[in-house]
Amino acid sequence: MSNKIKYNLKNVHAAIMTHTEDGGYSYETPVPIPGAVNLSLDAEGDTSPFYADGIVYFRAVSNNGYSGDLEIALVPDWFREKILKEVKDNNGVLIESNTDIEPVYFALLFEFDGDKKSIRHVMYNCSVSSRPTVEGKTKEESIEPGTETLSLKADAREDGLIKARTGSDTVDKTYQDWYKSVYVPEVTAEAQG
């Protein structure tokens, strides 16, 4: 049975992506990013109409992925080291410097609760487009936890793959193994045309 609603972002994970020698992709094992508060990713792309005979004769549509923000309680140290490329010194202090670095690409996995079953997602080719802001405020009469926000870009991989999500017909093993490894679709001869 299909969900009617979704709510409650949870189980955010990231898995670093690498290019393989044969031109493919591989992913490390997904690692949790605890403390998810909010995820907002806007679709990017264009439609370009071509007019002929007094009508829209053809319309080209492009899918340029997504961009937006992931708000979490705190960016984990492992994420700062492996993806933001901060360096831990001999005293265990994370150091950020202005050296030019290539962005680290990763898959972002997450889910929303549904009224029947959680909906699991994977964005295949993400990068951080800006470092988290450093901010805080004084404690007043009550403690209000602060959050940190990562600005993300989710582009298509070179093979065109952008994202996948589970649905009501998802095979149970695929659903249960979602966070064990990054799900990559199986392409059948029928699907290739």
Listing of model-derived features with the role each one plays in the protein:
Residues A15-I16, L108, Q192:
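Intrinsic disorder/low-complexity segments
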Residues V128-G193:
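Mixed-charge, glycine-accented linear interaction segment located at domain edges/termini
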Residues K4-K6, K10, K82-K88, K116-K117, ...:
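Context-gated lysine
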Residues T20, D89, R157:
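Acidic surface patches and DE-rich sequence motifs
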Residues E28-I33, R120-C126, K163-S168:
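Short amphipathic beta-strand/extended segments with alternating polar/hydrophobic composition
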Residues F58-Y124:
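Structured, beta-strand-rich domain cores
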Residues S2-R80, V128-T147:
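Solvent-exposed edge beta-strands and adjacent loop segments
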Residues I5, G23-Y25, P103, V122, ...:
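Intrinsically disordered, low-complexity segments enriched in small/polar residues
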